[in-house]
Protein backbone atom coordinates (compact mmCIF):
# COMPACT_ATOMS: atom_id res chain seq x y z
CA UNK A 1 0.00 0.00 0.00
CA UNK A 2 0.89 3.67 -0.06
CA UNK A 3 3.63 4.73 2.34
CA UNK A 4 6.43 7.26 2.90
CA UNK A 5 9.96 5.98 3.50
CA UNK A 6 11.34 6.45 7.01
CA UNK A 7 14.97 6.91 5.97
CA UNK A 8 16.77 9.96 4.53
CA UNK A 9 16.68 9.25 0.84
CA UNK A 10 15.60 6.47 -1.49
CA UNK A 11 17.04 6.16 -4.98
CA UNK A 12 14.99 4.02 -7.35
CA UNK A 13 16.35 2.59 -10.58
CA UNK A 14 13.67 1.28 -12.97
CA UNK A 15 13.58 -0.19 -16.45
CA UNK A 16 11.87 1.88 -19.15
CA UNK A 17 8.43 0.56 -20.07
CA UNK A 18 7.93 -0.98 -16.63
CA UNK A 19 6.02 1.77 -14.89
CA UNK A 20 3.66 1.50 -11.97
CA UNK A 21 5.25 3.85 -9.45
CA UNK A 22 2.95 6.68 -8.37
CA UNK A 23 3.65 9.52 -5.95
CA UNK A 24 1.40 11.77 -3.89
CA UNK A 25 3.31 15.04 -3.33
CA UNK A 26 3.99 16.02 0.27
CA UNK A 27 2.69 14.15 3.29
CA UNK A 28 -0.96 14.72 2.32
CA UNK A 29 -2.18 11.31 1.18
CA UNK A 30 -5.76 12.43 1.80
CA UNK A 31 -5.70 14.58 -1.36
CA UNK A 32 -5.33 11.41 -3.47
CA UNK A 33 -3.52 13.42 -6.15
CA UNK A 34 -1.48 10.48 -7.48
CA UNK A 35 1.02 11.14 -10.27
CA UNK A 36 2.50 8.31 -12.33
CA UNK A 37 6.29 8.31 -12.69
CA UNK A 38 7.32 6.91 -16.07
CA UNK A 39 10.75 5.28 -15.93
CA UNK A 40 13.24 6.53 -18.52
CA UNK A 41 16.79 5.65 -19.48
CA UNK A 42 19.46 7.23 -17.26
CA UNK A 43 16.87 8.67 -14.83
CA UNK A 44 16.96 7.90 -11.11
CA UNK A 45 13.83 8.55 -9.07
CA UNK A 46 14.65 10.12 -5.70
CA UNK A 47 12.20 9.97 -2.77
CA UNK A 48 12.81 12.09 0.31
CA UNK A 49 12.19 10.15 3.51
CA UNK A 50 10.77 11.14 6.89
CA UNK A 51 14.25 11.46 8.44
CA UNK A 52 15.37 14.09 5.91
CA UNK A 53 12.04 15.89 6.30
CA UNK A 54 12.67 16.11 10.05
CA UNK A 55 16.26 17.32 9.59
CA UNK A 56 15.12 20.01 7.15
CA UNK A 57 12.43 21.26 9.56
CA UNK A 58 9.78 20.19 7.02
CA UNK A 59 11.35 22.23 4.21
CA UNK A 60 11.86 18.98 2.25
CA UNK A 61 8.62 17.00 2.66
CA UNK A 62 8.60 13.24 2.33
CA UNK A 63 6.04 11.83 -0.07
CA UNK A 64 3.65 8.93 -0.12
CA UNK A 65 4.23 6.53 -2.98
CA UNK A 66 2.83 3.24 -4.19
CA UNK A 67 3.18 0.76 -7.03
CA UNK A 68 0.04 -0.08 -8.92
CA UNK A 69 -0.53 -3.12 -11.09
CA UNK A 70 -0.31 -2.40 -14.82
CA UNK A 71 -3.48 -2.27 -16.86
CA UNK A 72 -3.88 -5.03 -19.46
CA UNK A 73 -2.65 -2.84 -22.33
CA UNK A 74 0.38 -1.69 -20.25
CA UNK A 75 1.74 -5.09 -19.21
CA UNK A 76 5.21 -5.81 -20.65
CA UNK A 77 6.26 -8.77 -18.55
CA UNK A 78 7.74 -8.88 -15.04
CA UNK A 79 8.61 -5.52 -13.44
CA UNK A 80 12.13 -5.08 -12.14
CA UNK A 81 13.43 -2.19 -10.07
CA UNK A 82 16.35 -1.62 -7.72
CA UNK A 83 16.05 0.58 -4.62
CA UNK A 84 18.89 2.09 -2.58
CA UNK A 85 17.87 3.26 0.90
CA UNK A 86 20.17 5.86 2.49
CA UNK A 87 20.01 5.96 6.27
CA UNK A 88 21.80 8.12 8.82
CA UNK A 89 24.78 7.07 10.90
CA UNK A 90 23.23 6.57 14.33
CA UNK A 91 26.60 7.26 16.03
CA UNK A 92 26.72 10.89 14.81
CA UNK A 93 25.05 13.81 16.59
CA UNK A 94 23.63 16.55 14.36
CA UNK A 95 23.26 19.99 15.94
CA UNK A 96 21.15 22.81 14.57
CA UNK A 97 21.94 26.54 14.58
Protein language model features and the residues they cover:
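Catalytic core of Fe(II)/2-oxoglutarate
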Residues: 4, 14-97
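Conserved, non-catalytic sequence blocks in retroelement Pol enzymes and Pol-derived host proteins
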Residues: 1
